[in-house]
């Protein structure tokens, strides 16, 4: 083999090595690019996932905030409605109290009412002797109906007429007015108690009004609610 042949073979080997190196370099470049694209895609997907999660989290926060605000507004509205109902009920009670106060101003009808209240109190207590308290202004009216009240009670229960002691030392408060605007008041009626004070029947007009009002209060509130709803 001469020098020309040797040189030719060497050149062929060099070309082969160079070609193989280029192919290998291309393979490495393609592989690296694929890995880069995969990593880039993974990073993009990871960021998208983070963004979606953050969006969902904020969306839930907004929804929760809306529910809280709605609940607060609803509660505030309910409180306003209840307050308005309470104001109406208070006004009704005040108006009824004024009407009750007018009852004692008609002496003829009030005198009969006092007798009925005394008889009713005696029937509740069923005591042979009782202590009666009334307003100072009503003292003469009470005294005028005592005997007829005792007789009516005795006839109803077929017993002896009871002893009724009218308290001349302690009277029920006077009716509401400017002189006792901030103190206790009584619109009329009587308080009857057993002699030992253990049993008490409060049969004042104010107490009767309070009992009636409490019984009617659910119905009153129901009507107020239906009016608001309408």
Swiss-Prot record:
According to the UniProt record, one GO cellular component term is: proton-transporting two-sector ATPase complex, catalytic domain
SS bond partners? none
Matches recorded under Pfam families: vATP-synt_E
Q: Name one GO molecular function term.
A: proton-transporting ATPase activity, rotational mechanism
Q: Which UniProt keywords apply?
A: Hydrogen ion transport, Ion transport, Transport
| Domain of life of the source | Eukaryota
Q: Does the keyword Transport apply?
A: yes
Q: Quaternary structure per UniProt?
A: V-ATPase is a heteromultimeric enzyme composed of a peripheral catalytic V1 complex (components A to H) attached to an integral membrane V0 proton pore complex (components: a, c, c', c'' and d).
Functional description taken from the UniProt entry: Subunit of the peripheral V1 complex of vacuolar ATPase essential for assembly or catalytic function. V-ATPase is responsible for acidifying a variety of intracellular compartments in eukaryotic cells.
- HAMAP family listed in its UniProt record: ATP_synth_E_arch
The family line of this record is:
Belongs to the V-ATPase E subunit family.
What's the name of the protein? V-type proton ATPase subunit E
- Could you tell me the gene encoding this protein? VATE
């Amino acid at each position: 083999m001469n020098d020309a042949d040797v040189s030719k073979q060497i050149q062929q080997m060099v070309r082969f090595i160079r070609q193989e190196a280029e192919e290998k370099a291309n393979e490495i470049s393609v592989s690296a690019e694929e890995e880069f694209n995969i990593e880039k895609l993974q990073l993009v997907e990871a960021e998208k996932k983070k963004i979606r999660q953050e969006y969902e989290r904020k969306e839930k926060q907004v929804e929760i905030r809306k529910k809280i605000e709605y609940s607060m507004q609803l509660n505030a509205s309910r409180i306003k409605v209840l307050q308005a109902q309470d104001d109406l009920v208070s006004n009704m009670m005040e108006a009824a109290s004024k009407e009750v106060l007018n009852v004692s101003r008609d002496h003829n009808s009030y005198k009969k009412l006092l007798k009925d209240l005394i008889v009713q109190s005696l029937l509740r207590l069923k005591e042979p002797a009782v202590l009666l308290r009334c307003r100072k202004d009503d003292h003469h009216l009470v005294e005028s109906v005592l005997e007829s009240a005792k007789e009516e009670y005795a006839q109803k229960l077929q017993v002896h007429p009871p002893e009724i002691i009218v308290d001349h030392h302690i009277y029920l408060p006077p009716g509401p007015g400017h002189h006792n605007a901030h103190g206790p008041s009584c619109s009329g009626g009587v308080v009857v108690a057993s002699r030992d004070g253990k049993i008490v029947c409060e049969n004042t007009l104010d107490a009767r009004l309070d009992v009636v009002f409490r019984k009617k209060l659910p119905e009153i509130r129901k009507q107020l609610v239906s009016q608001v709803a309408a």
